[in-house]
Amino acid sequence: MAAVEAAAEPVTVVAAVGPKAKDEEEEEEEPLPPCEAVRWAPVGAVAEARPGATAFLEEATAEEPGAAPGSPPDSPGRTLRRLRAERRRLDSALLALSSHFAQVQFRLRQVVRGAPAEQQRLLRELEDFAFRGCPHVLGYEGPGDPASDEGDGLPGDRPWLRGEDQSEQEKQERLETQREKQKELILQLKTQLDDLETFAYQEGSYDSLPQSVVLERQRVIIDELIKKLDMNLNEDISSLSTEELRQRVDAAVAQIVNPARVKEQLVEQLKTQIRDLEMFINFIQDEVGSPLQTGGGHCECKAGGKTGNGCSRTGSSRTPPGNSKTKAEDVKKVRETGLHLMRRALAVLQIFAVSQFGCATGQIPPTLWQRVQADRDYSPLLKRLEVSVDRVKQLALRQQPHDHVITSANLQDLSLGGKDELTMAVRKELTVAVRDLLAHGLYASSPGMSLVMAPIACLLPAFSSAPEAMHPWELFVKYYHAKNGRAYVESPARKLSQSFALPVTGGTVVTPKQSLLTAIHMVLTEHDPFKRSADSELKALVCMALNEQRLVSWVNLICKSGSLIEPHYQPWSYMAHTGFESALNLLSRLSSLKFSLPVDLAVRQLKNIKDAF
């Protein structure tokens, strides 16, 4: 830039000084001998301004404010502004030309370093680029700019106009022209940037792929995904938010993935059915084939030189030489039997696939139906519970005025066999009645039987067993584990409160859920080390519930736990049918009574023995 300024200053001096100075300059510009020629500074180098140019600029700056807006075109101020605008155009043109030459040099280096097969293509691209022309880098200058008075041409090429005299149409045209030039410049700069990244990547100085190549590959991937997912995003992609686009993509992926998952599950189910069918066929073949192999016919066996109706163990493994015909008939019978069983098994599998409900009702024996109907009747269990509740209530009311407390003498009687009447009524009558009513229709859910063995089980007595029964105490233990009771009871704050007898919750009431978890934890802690039965643990829990007057609330928590009731109770059970409401009403008769029952009665003697040793 400074070199261009130094080159443009003599022109300005010629316009300001006059003909005499012009003649002197022409004399100075006479060609010098080659030995005395002065070498010019390179383009873009910094050059110091000469004293004459500095004085001229100061003088022009001093004259510029004095120029009137309506001064004629040949006034010094307007001439100075025009020369400055021309100087800016020359600077921009020189910069564009230098950039163009640099691009040509860059492409020439690509041609030289390129492969022989690529040189022809690079030369054609160089030719196209060389004749394309330099980009127009002049920005749009507003109407108030001094350079806008003369436009883009030289002085005298266009009529002199004021900015306010220009029409709106001319302004719009100039703006549109400027925008087009800017677009062309941006496009050319992008092309040059892509070429530079490509060359740097080929030379090894750029690690990642060029941005244009990355965008092209990403576009290919996105287009293929859109085709595979059957999505139409060309219309409303601009109006959708990021979350809406994500939801559309998830929905499209789900349409493809979900059927595949269903097919995989169906294939796994069919594999399981086929595997179970093969096991069933092998089982029946073993049952049917064993009589054929050990059938009671007359056979001749050479075992110790004796012939008889039976065969000894040493001679049974040998094949008699005269029984080849009998063996062929046996093999034929086995094949026919196997084919018959295969047809029956396929028929059963087809029925199962159609019905999906296992055996028909007509295949159930009448005696079994009567027995099941008898088991479903829970009215005797309710009567037994009512009788036990009334007996416990009578015994408790009889001992209420005396504050039923287990003393040391009573404890000695208990250990020696003299049982307390109220305690025995609670443990042997009330707890058993509650246990039987809770166990009505209760079973342990097990995924052991496959889908194929369910309908086939009715054909074989060995597979027609009822679901495995479950003890009601296990229901309380499952509730304890489901509610993470161990973490609640063994928390540091609760341990400290138990050690120092301080309330944890700051005086708030303990909920039934918290008290139930604590009670189950205490029963498990005391009874599990001594391997006590589930009945003993349930009796201890009932005694603790009566002592705390929470029997109804604790049982109600189990009844309201849907995650335990649904998978462990039959639809015809008392729990699923009535929700245990009538039983809770019966047990509520004991809620107002105070009890002080021993909880560790089943492990007290064992604890004493352990303490003794």
From Swiss-Prot:
Entry keyword Phosphoprotein? yes
CDD domains annotated for this entry? RUN_RUNDC1
Q: Where is the composition biased (Low complexity)?
A: 57-69
- Origin, by domain of life? Eukaryota
This protein's name: RUN domain-containing protein 1
The gene that this protein is the product of is RUNDC1
Q: What are the RUN domain coordinates in residue numbering?
A: 421-602
What segments bear the compositional bias annotation Polar residues? 309-325
UniProtKB keywords: Coiled coil, Phosphoprotein
- What is the native source organism of this protein? Homo sapiens (Human)
Q: Which InterPro entries match?
A: Run_dom, Run_dom_sf
